[in-house]
Amino acid sequence: MITAPASRLPVTVVTGFLGAGKSTLLRQLLLSSGLRLAVLVNEFGEVGIDGDLIRSCGFCPEEELDGRVVELANGCLCCTVQDEFLPVMQQLLQRADQLDGIVVETSGLALPLPLVQAFRWPEIRTRTRVTGVVTVVDGEALSNGSVVADPAALEAQRAADPSLDHLSDINSLFDDQLGAADLVLMSRADCLSEEAIQALQSRLSGQLRHGVSVLPMARGNVPAALLMGLDRPEEDEHHHDHDHDHDHHHHDHSHVAMDSVSLNWQGITSKAQLESLLPALIADHGLLRLKGRAWLPGKSHPLQIQAVGPRLECWFDSNSRLERPSSDGLELVALGLSLDASGVQEQLKGGLA
């Protein structure tokens, strides 16, 4: 659905080192999601490469490209927030009624947390909401003992950026990217054995916040619902004709296949009760995404609920056009891998009873 001008536009931040697979992931997301997304690409050194890869994939009509793909090539995004990032975001938000969301692809050197914190600036915090930070790691490089496939190229990228004001070593940057993640995607998983994938998942999980999952990925194939805090639009809304169906159908052992569980509760709940209950539900069952709404006593607007990994956000949606039902209640959809549906339902009901 097209986002109402007064509502907050969902933002997904994608981070990871040079060559990890961020642009491949974005191309697949843009081609397969059916959403009207704007992309902010931060790159330097090999100026324009990532932006050109995204522009050339045919995800939108050519006349819309300048308004849908914005490149920042003047340095590390987290170091140029005030001078570069905020003006571009304000420019994109002038077109918020034409967009379903924004994806920010950081350079390999950006610290994710300063960027996320920038969305709290008064100029944009009432117009956007960060639905998740997705960190892409190179599974093949990690299995070979390095956090990046080409350390020399990454060091050259560091040397080419005069605006860089943090001197963290590569391993520390990797730790920062993992520490900020709500979801970690392991690229090039099709080059690894199942045993190697499991070993890397176990190794990385020790560096992550509780509840953050590590998923294998090949050629950027990940369900859009996992990355964007949005509902897929109806087919008759801003549908585009594209001749790239061949890009949509890669299937192999590392393609993410998710289970979904619908959760419903009729009765009285409160925002505080849900904010206390849902983080444990997410962590205990390894939920990757949780979304839905609740109608609460005395409230005319629904409480919208969105979570990516452990990042949970609940807010009353004054822009909702949904008609209020006659009774209070909760409607949720949980996404995850090999979900214990009955266990998820029982824990939710036990916490609400």
Located regions from the model:
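A residue-level signal for conserved active-site and pocket-lining positions in enzyme catalytic cores
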Residues: 43, 133, 214, 274, ...
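Short, well-ordered beta-strand elements
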Residues: 105, 330-337
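Nucleotide-state-sensitive switch-loop elements of NTP-binding domains
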Residues: 2-15, 20-171
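C-terminal accessory "lid"/substrate-recognition subdomains
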Residues: 2, 151-321, 325-330, 339-342, ...
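Flexible glycine-/small-residue-rich
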Residues: 41, 137, 307-309, 336
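Residue-level signal for short, function-critical loop segments
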Residues: 43, 139, 188-189, 338
